[in-house]
């Protein structure tokens, strides 16, 4: 009669250890995702891997907002990492490579709508 109770306690203890280990490891090894965009344009058949439509970009930002992810700037991420601050596992960073006009024309209004910061890396050859 005592064997089932002991077995039950062992199983519950093992489950608790696994859950605690998962929580610890998730927090210990968590990395902040950096969402990197190039172009936010309606048609991009020649480079589909670096383009996203305005509608798709809107849906992605809506997902981030709806599921309460915290969007921080790249500068905030660097500061937090250098100060060894713990960030929420729902923290993300948004960046744009090249700083093309479509980033401003189509991406910026959506970012502004949600109040999301973003870092834009400009191509220096295009400046001035």
Which role does the model predict for each range below?
Residues 31, 42-44, 48-61, 65-128:
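Active-site beta->alpha N-cap acidic-glycine motif
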